[in-house]
A protein has these predicted regions:
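Short glycine-rich or small-residue beta-strand-to-loop segments that form or flank ligand, phosphate
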Residues: 23, 47, 88-94, 143-145, ...
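Glycine-rich oxoanion-binding loops at beta->alpha junctions
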Residues: 77, 115-136, 181-182, 198
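Glycine-rich phosphate/diphosphate-binding loop of Rossmann-like nucleotide-binding domains
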Residues: 86-126
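Glycine-rich phosphate-binding loop
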Residues: 132-170
Length: 222
């Protein structure tokens, strides 16, 4: 691997942790993003980046014509997804406004090679929508729940499923939502036992946590 002169990459992360280094694109130039993706793809066979702004994507794609950019998730893929697991991971989002964060989680899981199913717009304002899908959600090995506003949905789901639940607060909401802080605090104070919470808008973090939970549970199986 020829390493870019602006970054010190970690090509051994795939062997060490089970997933490769993923490029955070938001604060990088198009050339830096392209260089890093190209180098990681040379080392691992493929590469993936998150938070690539839509207005910068054409510049990156001009440098990497074989790459694929997804507008909803703001992710970019160079090469083919990995093949790592067959367990189903569910991504449940409260509202359509939460879609960018849920899409980031879904796209990241897809790159990592996991089976993933997204259940969109089934928040607590119309709780019957969740009840209509709950049996499908219960078939998942891990459930990622994405919600803004008051952040109630993860607590509700956490009381209805036996799988681990990862809560993702989003910055969606009006004034006193404080750009996701209200949802974050609500999730951290959930009465649903065992709920775990990642940072505001961090669909990527949830997508990395879910497979690590699965890998540990598989190690402990007889």
């Amino acid at each position: 691997m020829t390493e870019p002169n602006h970054s010190t990459l970690d090509p051994g992360r795939l062997a060490r942790q089970g997933f490769p280094e993923i490029v955070y694109c938001q604060s990088k130039t198009a050339a830096q993003v392209a260089d890093n993706l190209r180098a990681l793809a040379a080392a691992n066979g493929s590469a993936f980046g998150t938070r690539l702004p839509a207005d910068r994507a054409p510049e990156v794609l001009a440098l990497l014509p074989d790459a694929v950019y997804d507008t909803d998730s703001r992710t970019i893929l160079l090469g083919r997804p990995l093949r790592t697991g067959d367990n189903l991971i569910a991504v449940v989002s409260a509202g359509t406004s939460d879609l960018p964060v849920a899409a980031e989680a879904t796209a990241t899981l897809g790159f990592l090679g996991h089976r993933v199913r997204h259940f969109n717009d089934i928040g607590v304002a119309g709780i019957h929508r969740l009840h209509e899908r709950i049996e499908e959600i219960r078939s998942a090995a891990v459930v990622i729940v994405v919600a803004g506003m008051e952040g109630a949905l993860p607590s509700v789901v956490g009381g209805l499923v036996s799988a681990p639940v990862i809560a993702v607060p989003t910055s969606v909401g009006y004034g006193a939502a404080f750009e996701g802080l209200a949802a974050l605090l609500g999730m951290l104070n959930s009465c649903a036992s065992g709920l775990v919470v990642v940072n505001i808008d961090n669909g990527f973090g949830a997508a990395l946590a879910a497979p690590r939970m699965l890998s540990q549970s598989l190690k402990t199986m007889p």
